[in-house]
Amino acid sequence: MVMLIKCFLVTEKSVAELEKNVLTAIVDMRARKEHIKKEIEKLFNVEVERVNTLITPKGEKKAYIKLKPDYSAEEILSKLGVF
């Protein structure tokens, strides 16, 4: 199985999005929203509310992953050692 999530972004905007319970990640170009959702739910044992994707001018695919209110995006990043 191919890992769809390449890395999580820690920028000024992505840190502001954490307050809205949204994770920001660079994902594989072939990844579809439903596959990203399933992978996040499986890896971190959380429920995802929705996934929005866009392709950056650099040619990377970025995903905004909104978690359900019962889960904390900040906790996930702290488990990964980002914070």
From Swiss-Prot:
Q: Which UniProt keywords apply?
A: Ribonucleoprotein, Ribosomal protein, RNA-binding, rRNA-binding
Q: Which SUPFAM superfamilies match?
A: Ribosomal proteins S24e, L23 and L15e
Q: Name one GO molecular function term.
A: rRNA binding
Instruction: Provide an example Pfam family for this protein.
Output: Ribosomal_L23
GO biological process, alphabetically ordered: translation
Q: What GO cellular component entries does it have? A: ribonucleoprotein complex; ribosome
- Identify the domain of life: Archaea
PANTHER family xref list: 60S RIBOSOMAL PROTEIN L23A
Regarding protein family, the annotation reads: Belongs to the universal ribosomal protein uL23 family.
Subunit and interaction comment: Part of the 50S ribosomal subunit. Contacts protein L29.
Its function, per the record, reads:
Binds to 23S rRNA. One of the proteins that surrounds the polypeptide exit tunnel on the outside of the ribosome.
The protein here is known as: Large ribosomal subunit protein uL23
Q: Which organism is it from?
A: Archaeoglobus fulgidus (strain ATCC 49558 / DSM 4304 / JCM 9628 / NBRC 100126 / VC-16)
Query: What lineage, starting at the top, does this entry show?
Result: Archaea, Methanobacteriati, Methanobacteriota, Archaeoglobi, Archaeoglobales
Quote the gene name from the UniProt entry.
Answer: rpl23
